[in-house]
Each structure stands twice: as structure tokens, then as C-alpha cells.
Amino acid sequence: AAIQAGRAGAKTLLVERGAQLGGTTTTGGVSFPGLFDAWGKQVIAGIGWELVKESVELDGGTLPNFARVPQRHWQNQVLTNQFLYALLAEEKCTKAGVEIAYYEFPQAVTKTESGWTVNCVGFGTRRRVNCKQIIDCTGGAEVVGMVGFSRLREEERQPGSYLYRLGDGHEPGRTRLNRLYVHGADSTNSR
């Protein structure tokens, strides 16, 4: 969202709680995004796909053949190098004129006549941002909750994924990705 806003000419600030962009694909270590296809053709494109495609190309990888419909949908997930993905995301933000505030998060959001005031905090820093629009990509709809809107929680939630390797040392990146899904794991948090 930040890259598109920047490309469209909007003055954009991306407030990132962590050390890198990319969320679950990078910091979360689930570096096999999907799904970009259905019924034997690619159906999803855009900036997310641009990042995935370029990270695979830079890493010397290959993309799945979306014309082939696999027995299991996960067989068309794209194995990416999460480190390249994070670097590409930052590079694209920079080229689009997006300012990035790492290690910061919104503490309070207030409605104003002209939009919103967002108070952000981080290690040794505070900032007050006046803006016309807010896009909440926190994963838990934290900003949505701060402004007083209700958030939904389904009875059955998507389980978390746990990635590990036994034996040789871990070599991150697309070529050594081993994954295990724990179906039915409780993905609730402390809220």
C-alpha cells in the first residue's frame, strides 16, 4: 500500500514496528507466499507479485508453472529468499518517495477535522503525524481498534506455521526451506 501511494504521488510515511519490511514473509519467516493462481492461470498480480517475482529472479530461482493445476494448492507457492524480499521492498519504497520509520508503532489515533493525528513511539523517539488517510497493515488491526471500530475474530482461525530443520545448520533462503504446518494450532494472542 505504501509503495502504491508513493508511486501515485502521495506523501507517505510507513510506520514499521520491526527492523525490516515484509511482515510474515520476512520477519515471520514464512517465505513461500501464495497463492497467485487459480484454475490453471495467474489471477493475482500487483506490487506484492512484483516483489515476489523480482526476489525469485534475483536469487536465481524459478517460478511455478501456473498453467499446471497441482493436486495440492501449496505446490504452487513461490519459494522466495526473504532477505532479498525485504531489501527489494525497502528499495521500492525509497524509489517511490516513501519515508520509513523503523522500530516505531502507533500509540494513539485521533480523528481531526482534516483527517487523523497519529502519535507514534519508538526507542527514544516520539512523533506526531497529521494525515488524511491511514492504512492499517498491523496484522491485528491495531489502528482499527484504536479508532474504536470493532474487529472480527472468527471461531476457527488460521493456524500458525512452525518452521524448523533437524540436522545440518540452518541456511536461510529459498533453496533450504523446510516447512511443517501444525493444523489446528491456537493462533490467538494475548488480546
Locate each region found by the language model:
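Conserved N-terminal/central alpha/beta ligand/cofactor-binding core
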Residues: 10-11, 16-108, 112, 152, ...
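N-terminal Rossmann-like FAD-binding beta1-loop-alpha1 element of flavoenzymes
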Residues: 1-13
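N-terminal glycine-rich phosphate/pyrophosphate-binding loop and immediately adjacent elements
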Residues: 92-99, 119-120, 136-139
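Anion (oxyanion) recognition and catalysis
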Residues: 6, 94, 145
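Conserved beta-strand-loop-beta-strand element in the redox core of flavoprotein oxidoreductases
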Residues: 110-128
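Surface-exposed charge patches
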Residues: 3, 91, 142
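Flavin (FAD/FMN)-binding glycine-rich loop and adjacent Rossmann-like elements that form
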Residues: 24, 86, 103, 122-133, ...
